Design a protein with these regions (language model features):
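Conserved, single-site charged/polar hotspot
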Residues: 1-286
Length: 286
C-alpha cells in the first residue's frame, strides 16, 4: 500500500538500523528496501497484533522505529523498487537481515527450525565466491575468525572482527550451580561455524546451553569491553554481538579467577542479508 511505502522511507532513514555510512551506496539501500518491504508484507499477512489494530510493534521484537526524517537516498531506494518483494517459488520469503557478518552466513536452523523450511537462507561466504566453508570444528573456526583478511564484502565494518575478555566472576552472575567456572567450550557448531551449544565446566559440575541467542545472553555482560575491527573499543552491551565465536581459556590467577578471551565476528544472528555486506558489495559496483 501507499502507507506501507511511506513508512519504508522513514524506516530506511533510521540510523539505528542502517547507520550513516550505509547511506553512501544506493544499490545497497535498494536491497534493504526490498527486504524491509517483504518483511512488512509477511507481518501484515501474519496479523499477529490484530487485537491491537496493528501488525508489528516498534521494539526489537519486530522493527525499532524512532520517527526519524527521510533522506533523498532512502526515498530513491524505496521509489525505484516500488512494489518489489523477494520470493521463492512464487511466495514472498521470510526476509531476514542483520547488521554485519563474520565473513560467512548461517541458515534457518539458527532459530532451531528445520532449514528445509527456508531453503533460501543459505550458509555461504560473504564474498564473490558465495560458497559454504567447512567451519564445523573449533580448530577450523579459530583459524577463520582470527583471519582478518578474508576478502569478505563487509571486512571494513567495525564489528567484522571483535574480541573481549571475561572471567569466572563475571560469568557467575548469569551461570549458577556449577561452582567456580573453570572452562568454556563450544561443543557444537551450526552451518557457517555459529556456536550452537556451549558447555560450561565448574568445580562442582557442568551445564550445557543451546541456541545462539542463549549463548549470547549467558556470555554477555554490560561490563565487557570489546575491541573492534576499527581498533577502538565499546562497552555496555547486555549480550554478545554474535554467536560466531571462538573461546580461549587464559588460565586461573592467584585469586582463583579464570579468564577467557572470546574472539568473535559480526553483529546479529547471521541469517539472510548482511547490511554491511550489501554495502561492501555495492561499493564494488555489484
Amino acid at each position: 500500500s501507499v502507507s506501507a511505502e511511506f513508512m519504508l522511507t522513514r524506516f530506511l532513514g533510521l540510523g539505528v538500523t542502517v547507520g550513516g555510512q550505509w547511506l553512501i551506496v544506493v544499490e545497497a539501500l535498494k536491497a534493504q528496501a526490498i527486504c524491509a518491504r517483504t518483511y512488512a508484507w509477511r507481518q501484515i499477512q501474519g496479523n499477529a497484533y490484530s487485537k491491537y489494530g496493528a501488525h508489528v510493534d516498534d521494539s526489537t521484537n519486530y522493527q525499532v522505529y524512532n520517527n526519524t526524517n527521510t533522506f533523498e537516498s532512502t526515498d530513491t531506494a524505496v521509489n525505484e523498487t516500488f512494489g518489489q518483494l523477494l520470493a521463492y517459488e512464487g511466495e514472498p520469503i521470510e526476509a531476514f537481515y542483520y547488521s554485519t557478518s563474520c565473513g560467512h552466513s548461517t541458515d534457518g536452523s539458527v532459530w532451531g527450525a528445520d532449514p528445509a523450511g527456508t531453503p533460501y537462507l543459505r550458509a555461504v561466504s560473504i564474498d564473490e565466491n558465495a560458497k559454504e566453508l567447512s567451519l564445523s570444528s573449533n580448530e577450523e573456526f579459530k583459524a577463520f575468525i582470527q583471519n582478518e583478511n578474508s576478502g569478505a564484502y563487509d571486512a571494513d565494518a567495525a564489528m567484522f572482527r571483535w574480541q573481549t575478555t571475561t572471567d569466572s566472576t563475571i560469568l557467575s552472575e548469569k551461570i549458577g550451580g556449577v561452582g567456580r567456572i573453570t572452562g568454556l567450550t563450544v561443543t557444537e557448531r551450526g552451518p557457517g561455524g555459529i556456536a550452537r551449544t556451549l558447555k560450561v565446566v565448574g568445580t562442582e559440575g557442568s551445564k550445557t546451553f543451546s541456541s545462539q541467542s542463549k549463548i549470547r545472553t549467558i556470555l554477555g555482560n554490560p561490563s565487557l569491553v570489546y575491541t573492534r575491527n576499527a581498533d577502538d573499543t565499546i562497552t555496555g552491551w547486555d549480550t554478545l554481538p554474535s554467536a560466531f565465536i571462538y573461546i580461549e581459556n587464559e588460565g586461573t590467577d592467584e585469586n582463583q579467577v579464570t579468564k577467557f578471551t572470546i574472539y568473535g565476528g559480526g553483529y546479529g544472528h547471521g541469517a539472510g542479508m548482511s547490511q554491511n555486506g550489501a554495502q561492501g558489495r555495492g561499493k564494488t559496483g555489484k
